[in-house]
A protein has these predicted regions:
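SAM/dcSAM-binding transferase cores
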Residues: 191-229
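SAM-dependent Rossmann-like transferase core, predominantly class I methyltransferases
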Residues: 3-41, 47-57, 211-212
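Glycine-rich, phosphate-binding/catalytic loops in enzymes
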Residues: 31, 125-128, 175-176
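General small-molecule cofactor/ligand-binding pocket signal
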Residues: 15, 64, 88-90, 181-184
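Conserved SAM/SAH cofactor-binding pocket of Class I
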Residues: 32-122, 145
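Mobile active-site "lid"/loop adjacent to the S-adenosyl-L-methionine
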Residues: 113-142
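Conserved Class I SAM-dependent methyltransferase catalytic core
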Residues: 19, 137-194
């Protein structure tokens, strides 16, 4: 399968091919929204070809990407080597997270989870893309359970999701003690409904203190800065 190389806003490169979803807006915006502390242990759940892990890269972070599809993980490993950065590419099913990573071993989780229920939404062009786009291999609940398991109390997780399924995400988060602390909606313009929502949660603690940040508008100066950083 022919590969392409994407140049990321932070100067790193990403290997891709047509079997898997290529770099999109969601991963770029989530990487700008997420705020792992210095020297944090970070897990990218369902990392695919590693776009989000590479976008969020800082030399002080200890980043692990977990992915079920070996082909996608191979591309991630190649990108790690291309960039000369230190990351861990881990093959495994997040539904079996207890056999893969220790409980409470992460400070921060990032994830672009499945958008649609199985059988809903547009059909993907390949089985690999179908797995990534829909709840075919795991559900949103599987994702939140895995995130909560690896986070220590006080650890945080950041997600990007479809606004029309926000309640599904919030319900799943509440079942595993992940409390939303920051929300930000992405709009194509000032008159359009949101096309994506960014959410940061904290494991444990009070449900008070949710911050809804100002909308992020596509084609705004801030949006351009995110892509040009």
């Amino acid at each position: 399968m022919p590969q392409t190389i994407e140049h990321l806003p932070n100067g790193l490169t990403l290997r891709q091919d047509d079997r898997f979803f290529k770099l999109g807006q969601d991963s770029v915006l989530l990487s700008a929204f997420a705020r792992p502390r210095r020297n944090a242990r970070v897990l990218d759940l369902g990392c695919g070809t590693g776009a989000l892990a590479l976008l969020i890269y800082r030399p002080d972070l200890q980043i692990t990407g977990l992915e079920i599809q070996e082909g996608a993980l191979d591309l991630f490993r190649q990108s790690i080597a291309d960039n000369g950065v230190k990351m861990t590419a881990l093959q495994g099913d997040l539904r079996r997270i207890r056999a893969l990573l220790p409980h409470g071993s992460m400070d921060y989780v990032i994830c672009n989870p499945p958008y649609f229920d199985r059988g809903a939404g547009k059909s993907a062009a390949s089985p690999e893309k179908q797995t990534a786009r829909q709840d075919a291999s795991c559900t949103v609940e599987d994702v939140t359970v895995a995130a909560s398991f690896v986070l220590h109390t006080g650890g945080k997780a950041a997600f990007v999701f479809r606004p029309e399924r926000l309640w599904t995400l919030l319900e799943a988060l509440s079942r595993v003690r992940l409390v939303p602390k920051r929300l930000r909606f992405v709009h194509q313009n000032t008159l359009a409904p949101p096309s994506a929502v960014l959410a940061e949660c904290r494991k444990g603690g009070s449900a008070e203190g949710l911050i809804v940040e100002p909308p992020l508008l596509v084609q705004s100066e801030e949006y351009s800065r995110i892509y040009e950083k």
